[in-house]
């Protein structure tokens, strides 16, 4: 493959057939160490997960960035909770293969996910967790209106050390409004 900055990527919905590509990307130490993933990912588990996300009634959207048929990044929105009173909230997750980090792929994925949440799902709140030492990811999220809401100390074990996680969220910048019809004469 050529130099990453010279090849355009395309975005599309993730498919169950991407499972092997997800497993390969998640084998990259610098990728999975920034997520809650474990080493040695299983392609069949990814296939099952991607199949459920593509169900016609699922509000989830899982996108991939692809170059010459190879998945180089993924990002998705999924319900943050099962409680009905939190159905206005989606959680966001993202991973980008190391050679493609800091090349605009994350921004392209974020643009599409925010558009989907804002204009097609009516999501009021998108939330995420990011490790406190992942400064490039934090900068990307801030660029899209995410704000720091809190810190979870010793949140996860990573490479033999406990690391903190920052909770960030973005509220819909212009929530949809409803203009009720004028009352009719009875």
Q: Residues of each region from the PLM?
A:
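Hydrophobic alpha-helical core bundles mediating ligand binding, dimerization, or RNAP-core interactions
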Residues: 22-26, 30, 46, 50
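Terminal substrate-recognition subdomain of acyl/acetyltransferases
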Residues: 2-3, 94, 161-186
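A short beta-loop-alpha structural element at the N-terminal edge
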Residues: 10-24
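Conserved GNAT acetyl-CoA-binding A-motif
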Residues: 110, 118-129
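Conserved acetyl-CoA-binding loop-helix of GNAT-fold acetyltransferases
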Residues: 102-117, 138-143
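Acetyl-CoA-dependent GNAT
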Residues: 9, 16, 35-99, 116, ...
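Amphipathic alpha-helical recognition patches that constitute DNA-binding helices
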Residues: 21, 91, 125, 136, ...
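Conserved catalytic-core motifs of GNAT/GCN5-like acyltransferases
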Residues: 125-130, 142, 147-163
